Amino acid sequence: NNEHDNTLTDLYYDDVEMIKYQKERYVNALDKYIDLKKKFLGLDEIHMYDLYVPLVKEFDKKITFETAKKEALASVALLGQEYVEAYEKGLNSRWIDVYENEGKRSGAYSSGQRVHPFVLMNFANSLDTEFTLAHEMGHAMHSYMSTKYQAPLDRHYKIFVAEVASTCNEALLMDYLRKQSLDPKFQAYLINHFMEQFRTTLFRQCMFAEFEKIINEKTANNEVLTSDTLNQIYADLNKFYYGEDVIVDDEISMEWARIPHFYMNFYVYQYATGFSAAMALSQKLLHGTQADIEAYLSFLKSGCTKSPVELLRMAGVDMASPKPIEDAIELFDSLIDEFESIMK
């Protein structure tokens, strides 16, 4: 396990450096997205808070949980009978605490147990919470498959691979929904949702990872970290990542203080690596061969029997190379172009 953790430490440093080396491609893609936001929101200048305004308004149509279940299940049909039957059983056998309730915590979580996985979510009859269902069932099925095929000590997969299975299922649902309707407004809404995932999961989490790297190195060098120092580092990183096109208001410099993951050292970069791996694997599942599907299913069944990097390599993606992140940036770039052409 120490060997596994050392591999992840190396990968952490490699990924943060890789992002910096790719700053030009990376920032160009983000600049392009910010220009798109400015144009479609009709803004002369754009602040950090404007980035959260969707380019396409949320649909009025309410999605029932039954519809969400049906579509989420249909989107994973390509993963084969065993996966689909277990997934359907989970949807219909009370694995999920579905709706908001008084005193219930917000958000969504999955917990893998020997009896079967449990999912907590707050379904709100929206497309966003349909994607949440797909995401959490991705975690649940990863737990189910690992528990079924591995001994108790080998069934607990590492956080590094956890976000891959969940995000992969979101990508499969995205593909399924986009094929169901050619309505330009619906297509634009889905692409907007997808682009925001890239911004918040790939770009933003990499910025968080770099912030962590800087402050931990300062601590290792016996430098004192005051709130002013932390604010300055965080503000500089926002300027570095978002460029001159976005007005970085003073208030954003304190955002680091409200990110709970900073209290779980070196967690956030795994969202970015997991997202990149999931994009690569979902493309293989959708456009590859039966062998690609079998490799992915073997990965889901493997628990923690190999290091996370080896498991992902077995699934069909090499996270020790820059290619998955490069390909993810390329996909983001193509989504921006597609969105513009739809909205013309």
Regions from the language model: what does each represent?
Residues 1-118, 318:
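Contiguous, non-catalytic segments that form substrate-binding/exosite surfaces or channel walls
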Residues 1-4, 30-41, 138-148, 167-184:
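Long, well-ordered alpha-helical segments
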Residues 2-13, 41-50, 133, 141, ...:
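C-terminal, non-catalytic "cap/extension" segments appended to globular domains
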Residues 5-19, 50-61, 81-84, 114-127, ...:
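Glycine- and acidic
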Residues 19-30, 69, 195, 230-241, ...:
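Short amphipathic alpha-helical coiled-coil/interface segments
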Residues 74-85, 111, 139, 143-151, ...:
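Conserved helix-loop functional segments at active or binding sites
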Residues 124-146, 166, 171, 211, ...:
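Active-site recognition of the HExxH zinc-binding catalytic motif
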Residues 157-185, 194-196, 200, 274, ...:
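Post-HExxH zinc-binding segment in Zn-dependent metallohydrolases
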